[in-house]
């Protein structure tokens, strides 16, 4: 932990980090890293989990369904924030985040032994989603406790620096999950890893749980909470004080819309959406994609502490808003460049032989079927389903009513067919033939099934991914201190946890699912970026004009 001392001198030269403070930062951060590792394993393995737990639907639909299960954990995070936030404000910070880490570790380990769809049928995805819900509840109580605990140990003028170490934990947890997955995949080989080896990273959670519990048992309660408890000033009804009184509720709402919503979409775009874009859209080898993301996280992670420490000097608000604005302005050119350098064959094919679906819009359905029940049998739907499965970008061209949909690839036109009234056997024959014709035409036009490793410009892809991570560090590094400083100590755990987890659980957690559904519906591989851009712009506007700067506030007030 010598790095803690060396990096702490920038904003408060008269205070060096003592042994107790180092222990607080290290123990809180390490336990939270393990918890994020548990939570993000699922997202890192979403494509493999889709095959094991969501069988019976096409590859794209199964992946979107797996993303929905991933998002289920995010959906309940605000409820975890309410349940454990209340406990944290009533019984203490330390004991509450001990409970959360046990729930997280056990539920993650169970995923490692859970039979798949082929063994226990529909019970498999149901149990999986239940475990994701438990993970979400646990994480909903973890972050607010860790951030509050560390901030309440920090000396004045050092809260941004101290809490920035907590801010590294989500990215380090993701990095750790990718590293473990990469090691297992390399050791076992792709076939064995995808068959059964993917379970090993989940089972590792038992060991991490034991380490985390031991470390946290060594900690003392927050000095702010102890003093408040001794003076009888702790809240007896933190939920009522937080959300039933307008003077505090309006701060909660603004912390969400003018802070955590934008922070969340920048965070998930820069890490998870970027990973899924490499895997699903650019068809880069999973091992390579994970390595590139892990490399960008390794390079970018120190900037959490840099921006957190910088916020102690120049303020939290300006850095966070700058990150939102930079992300919104540059996302489109960055992701276009990722295509150009990550899979140049797709980029060139798009330029030389653009794909167009010529169809009557009345025949075209919304290409999003997470439960696998929709029947895409019109000529338009059949064409779009095949293109979506291959992640082929296409434009929509309106055709006259009554015409059969066509797919134009450069100068070549392939006619689809109407399958609505065909018998099952005839439909399969026609669809197989149409799929084969379309596949041949796409191949001749230069659209690859997978990215060619020899053509990928790895340094440029890594640079672009690192820029995305830098945006993440700008919005995320200072935000824990900002949230802690917005609320009084007696209801801090509850009040800060809810906007954080609605922002990150809902606005951010659903981003991959919503964005890929937007892509599947439109055929534009960049269309999903509108979601984070709009949210980031909203946060920047509200944050700049309505949110206060808090770096000089006294956080001991109750």
Residues covered by each model-derived region:
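Extracytoplasmic gate region of multi-pass secondary transporters
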Residues: 42-43, 248-296, 334-335, 362-397, ...
